[in-house]
């Protein structure tokens, strides 16, 4: 890389609401700034833009969330203008709709392009007739100079379902967490007390935390069905944004009442201080019924020295050590999930601490934010000198 000019990196993401992909984008932007790059982010906005402002990182508000073909087409020029005006050296895109715009903008400006595939891009789209169209729509992600995937599960899935020369440009970079941020020793008691008051939590019950946006495959219904079979006393908090899935959230609220769990399960909106939420809880559940590409909650929980219960599919198989840092159960097996929950509720403090220490070490050794950011930045550096 030339030393005479700070390299400008533009990350593009549909929105900056709560979520692992969004936080990862901000983490990399902050790491870039520390390493004398000029980071920028383009999105349709959201609550996490505050983090960018706080870090003095420039944000461009563009409707890159839209899948409307006209909007995608018009965004080509908008991204091209940013590239030219800000002298952007490399663009990193994390979703398909903005990737269509960014691909042509980068092609017109001869700018290096990186994509990150965060999911499997399910191919059973609407009906079998639309399958080829869905595959074409997805394939834009593989036209980048380097394609980053967040787990070996995703890499194997893509190589199995898509053909092309992109196999040589795929790089696995598992996501990471900021170890200090999720260090329970850094979370003050006042933050926890404030949160208990904010959520109006009972102090005489062990709290189960399920951090997940409200969408059907995250497993809210699976967890509720399992909770009806739990023998020990508990209180469960489901925290997350509905991301436009308001009908699904309403369905979950109704199910909680119908299953006589209104006094034991509470839904709260997404909020910023997740380390405090992890500290106040007894353990964490991530009951996805479809494979997670990676599953950031699993490593956040372990970094916070909390036991994690998750389903035995997707990225969880790469992040959780079964019966050492957490427990893995089959999707939809309500008996197994209820049994795992009861087992943790009955554990001694010594057993809980043993799992917590093992989880923290697992993340320190394999899933640190610094490692994830540095591996991503190394990809940028290689492309910028090629």
Where are these regions (language model features)?
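Short hydrophobic beta-strand element within catalytic cores of glycosyltransferases
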Residues: 41, 307-310, 320
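A short, active-site helix/loop in glycosyltransferases that binds the activated sugar's phosphate group
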Residues: 144-169, 177-182
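Short His-centered aromatic/hydrophobic patch
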Residues: 93-99, 117
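A short, well-ordered alpha-helix in the C-terminal region of glycosyltransferases
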Residues: 197, 325, 343, 351-366, ...
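Conserved acidic donor-binding segment of nucleotide-sugar-dependent glycosyltransferases
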Residues: 322-323, 327-335, 343-349
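A conserved mid-protein helix/loop that constitutes part of the nucleotide-sugar donor-binding site
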Residues: 19-27, 206-229, 250, 335, ...
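Glycosyltransferase donor-sugar binding loop
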Residues: 42-47, 177, 211, 235-251
């Amino acid at each position: 890389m030339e030393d005479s000019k700070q390299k400008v990196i533009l990350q593009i993401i549909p929105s900056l609401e709560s979520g692992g992909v969004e936080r990862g984008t901000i983490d990399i932007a902050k790491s870039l700034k520390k390493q004398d790059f000029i980071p920028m982010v383009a999105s349709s906005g959201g609550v996490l833009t505050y983090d960018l402002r706080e870090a003095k990182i420039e944000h461009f508000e563009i409707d890159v969330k839209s899948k409307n073909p006209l909007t995608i087409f018009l965004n080509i020029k908008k991204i091209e203008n940013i590239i030219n005006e800000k002298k952007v050296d490399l663009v990193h895109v994390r979703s398909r709709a903005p990737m269509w715009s960014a691909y042509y903008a980068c092609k017109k400006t001869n700018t290096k392009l990186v994509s990150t595939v965060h999911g499997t891009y399910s191919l059973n789209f609407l009906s079998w007739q639309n399958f080829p169209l869905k595959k074409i729509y997805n394939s834009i992600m593989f036209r980048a100079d380097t394609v980053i995937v967040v787990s070996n599960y995703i890499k194997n899935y893509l190589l199995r379902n898509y053909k092309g020369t992109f196999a040589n440009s795929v790089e696995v970079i598992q996501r990471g967490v900021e170890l200090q941020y999720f260090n329970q020793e850094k979370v003050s008691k006042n933050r926890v007390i404030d949160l208990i008051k904010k959520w109006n939590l009972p102090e005489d019950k062990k709290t189960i935390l399920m951090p997940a946006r409200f969408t059907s495959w995250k497993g809210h219904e699976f967890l509720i069905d399992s909770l009806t079979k739990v023998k020990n006393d508990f209180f469960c908090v489901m925290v997350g944004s509905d991301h436009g899935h308001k009908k699904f959230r309403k369905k979950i609220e109704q199910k909680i009442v119908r299953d006589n769990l209104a006094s034991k399960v509470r839904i709260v909106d997404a909020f910023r201080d997740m380390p405090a939420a992890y500290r106040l809880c007894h353990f964490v559940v991530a009951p996805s019924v479809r494979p997670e590409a990676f599953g950031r909650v699993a490593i956040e929980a372990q970094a916070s020295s909390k036991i994690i219960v998750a389903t035995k599919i997707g990225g969880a198989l790469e992040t959780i050590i079964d019966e050492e840092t957490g427990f893995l159960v089959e999707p939809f097996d309500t008996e197994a999930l209820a049994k795992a929950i009861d087992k943790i509720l009955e554990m001694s403090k010594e057993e809980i601490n043993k799992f917590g220490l093992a989880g923290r070490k697992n993340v320190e050794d394999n899933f640190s934010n610094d490692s994830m950011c540095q591996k991503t930045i190394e990809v940028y550096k290689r492309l910028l000198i090629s």
